[in-house]
Amino acid sequence: MDSSSLLPSQWSDLPLDILELISDRLDHDSSDTIHLLCLRSVCATWRLSLPLSNKNNRLSKFPKYLPFWSSSSSSSGFFTLKQSNVYKLEAPLNPRTCLVKLQETTPGIMRVLDLFSNDRICFLPENFPSKIDLQEFHVRLVRRTYRMEYANNGGGAVPCFWSLHSDKVVILSSGEDSAIIAIHSGGKLGFLKSGNDEKWKILDNSWNVIYEDIMLYKDNRCIVVDDKGKTVIYDVDFKVSDLAEGLVGGGGHKKHLVECSGGEVFLVDKYVKTVWCKSDISKSVVEFRVYNLKREEKRWEEVRDLGDVALFIGDDCSFSVQNPAGDLAGGFIFYSDYRNGGRSRGICSDGDGVFNVDMQGDFVFSIKPNYFGP
């Protein structure tokens, strides 16, 4: 046997062109800062050779300031496009899974956000590490999410009927073509293409259509659902196709789209009901119904058993996790619960709820399951 085969691999001696090839091989969906940090953590040579700047970042396709809904005039202010990512952290010697939502503020520096919203978590749990060694954790991107925030440049007042933010934003990309599609004031669907677009355009201006959720599907398409459950899909050229008719009777109060493993699409319909107790005091309860998309039949079919899948319903994005570790197994829906005076800001929120799909019941938990992250 050749003695050289017994020597450990000298990763630091890898030719620079090979290292650049490895970096370029990060596909568009997974190429974010965390994956670059994982590569850079191998050795000092790799850290020096791989910059933190990410040329595949979709935000780079658009200007720093986006036009406001109502006008291309800068006097109305601007939107800034923000990105955050949900990650699943797994340690080889620890069976528990941790979910964490991060926003990169400067290259390599992350801010921890509430899992169900975009609130910054200022006070982390005592057992949450101040630093995460990427050589000790397996990191998987669960969901990438975007939102737009209003930035006033000192101009005039903005009419109150215009929304100053949007948590329902996707970026479509195909080759050199990119576009932002967002749900804004009144549930309308607006888009802005990269390049020379200086004003938002409306995709569907029907007076009786109110869109409630939008979801990126396989990079260059997006799925949109309205308040009645009618669902359509757009491609990067804004060609639209019907996916499913609406729910019988229109369904509940709020629709959420979730993509599961294998490209399966779920519709989570949220009901908020008022019940009367013996004390004549009303109490609101939350109920969810879950539907699976039947594309060939163009309809939603109700699902009674989620198996080992848990669904997470957030303000800006929803996602699924298969067989999560911790105190609760699959078959549950976790969501933000605003019924009891709102949610805590700046700390681990104590207003989160969980719904058992099997038992059709909900409750609020004061301590998050172990796999939630901070």
UniProtKB/Swiss-Prot annotation:
Pfam families (UniProt xref): Beta-prop_KIB1-4
All copies of domain F-box, residue ranges: 9-61
Coiled-coil regions listed: none
InterPro entries membership: KIB1-4_b-propeller, SCF_F-box_domain
Top-level taxon: Eukaryota
Matches recorded under PANTHER family: DUF295 DOMAIN-CONTAINING PROTEIN, F-BOX PROTEIN SKIP23
Protein name stated in the entry: Putative F-box protein At5g60060
Source organism of the structure: Arabidopsis thaliana (Mouse-ear cress)
